[in-house]
Amino acid sequence: MASEEGQVIACHTVETWNEQLQKANESKTLVVVDFTASWCGPCRFIAPFFADLAKKLPNVLFLKVDTDELKSVASDWAIQAMPTFMFLKEGKILDKVVGAKKDELQSTIAKHLA
């Protein structure tokens, strides 16, 4: 379900995932996807930081996918470790950050907004 600007949108169904990507492709919006898992300690550590980035950057679409909940999406995107952050624009992968690396996450977003 889509939420307000400046929030992380959790994709609980493949349909929601596809809808969000479609909208982002049409608007040429930068998308940052957090592939996460409920049991993943580093994922829980970085989640508040990811949410804070979403508040600070309302012109970027922040999505969250639980790899256990949407196994097919995680498989399609070849997710091997959590957290993995994918940076997408117009349906293309621009970049990827693996691990709870705050500085790298922030600098990669800045790079693709420049």
From Swiss-Prot:
Residues 2-114 form the Thioredoxin domain. The keyword Cell membrane does not apply. Disulfide bonds join C40-C43. Its main location: cytoplasm. Coiled coil: none annotated. It is found in: Cytoplasm. SUPFAM superfamilies: Thioredoxin-like. The modification N-acetylalanine is found at A2. The record marks G41, P42 as: Contributes to redox potential value. Keywords: Acetylation, Cytoplasm, Disulfide bond, Electron transport, Redox-active center, Transport. The record marks D34 as: Deprotonates C-terminal active site Cys. The active site is at C40 (nucleophile), C43 (nucleophile). Interacts with FBA6. Interacts with MDH1. This is Thioredoxin H1. It comes from Arabidopsis thaliana.
